[in-house]
Amino acid sequence: MRRALALALLALLSGACSNEQQIPDETNAPAQRVVTFAPHLAEIVFAVGAGESLVGVSAWSDFPEAVRDLPLVGDAFTVDQEQLSLLQPDLVLVWQSGMPAHTVDELRARGFRVESVRTRSLGDIVAAMRRIGTLTGHNELAETAAGEFSQVLDTLRERHREAAPIDVFFQISSRPLYTVNREHFISEIIAICGGRNIFDDLEGFAPTVDIEAVLDRDPDVMLAGANVGDDAFMEWARWPDLAANRYNNKFLLPDETIGRPSPRLALAAQSVCFALEAARSNMRDAS
């Protein structure tokens, strides 16, 4: 299960490109039968008040609880054509950074209305909430949800505006060693909390790095999502002079929400800020 979640997260971070063109809905009628091909899209559908219109979801969709009982239509890379035909959706939401373009084209060729949703940045997530609200006829609820999400982030940003800068390494996976660049929503969250992503200058949404590069940049803090596992930082113990080791600043975030570009990232951002506050405290105590 943990390995599957890690693979799904890496797919999200890899930025596989799919076509953003949509088949127009000439009636402009709100969608009544929606399927989603990524767990975070199902979350957004519920967040904007359109949960009752959701009739099918992708593998690993587990939040909110209600999605666990819905039929599975595949994942970002495969489509259960038979199940999709049975469900007859009037809106198919796909993940722009995950589903391959040829799969999107095949869905459109079969006559399905497909909306390709971009969720690479925090701003993208807000836009996705509003767009899905419009498509499902829940504009007002979507605007409220988007506003609440933005307000949490704005509050955290203001709270940490004067915080002492702190160098952060975010570890997506251990083998291979993946991290995030400046364009990634995780890097945005680190910045909101007053941190500096040590690999913000790299190309690629989720670049691979080697151990030597991490040691050379000597982060004050190491963060990882729960999907990496309890042993996420075990290998780093070999270098006691690493700043994150000297300050005891290695934090495994409490759940997997940091890897999902959904409204629950507001909660994940609070966890990141809490970790960086604890890290600063550890550094003060050590000085």
Language-model features: locations:
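A ligand-binding cleft/hinge motif common to bilobed small-molecule-binding domains
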Residues: 98-109, 216, 221-238
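Extracytoplasmic substrate-binding proteins
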Residues: 19-33, 90-91, 101-178, 199-201, ...
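Short secondary-structure boundary segments
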Residues: 38, 96-97, 172, 202, ...
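C-terminal motif of bacterial Sec signal peptides marking the signal peptidase cleavage site
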Residues: 13-16
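Short helices/loops that flank or line small-molecule/ion binding pockets
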Residues: 81-88, 110, 209-218
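His/Asp/Glu-enriched short active-site or ligand-binding loop at hydrolase and phosphoryl-transfer sites
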Residues: 58, 183-206, 226, 251-252
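Sec-dependent signal peptide recognition
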Residues: 2-7
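A short, structured surface patch at a secondary-structure boundary
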Residues: 33-87, 91-98, 102-103, 198, ...
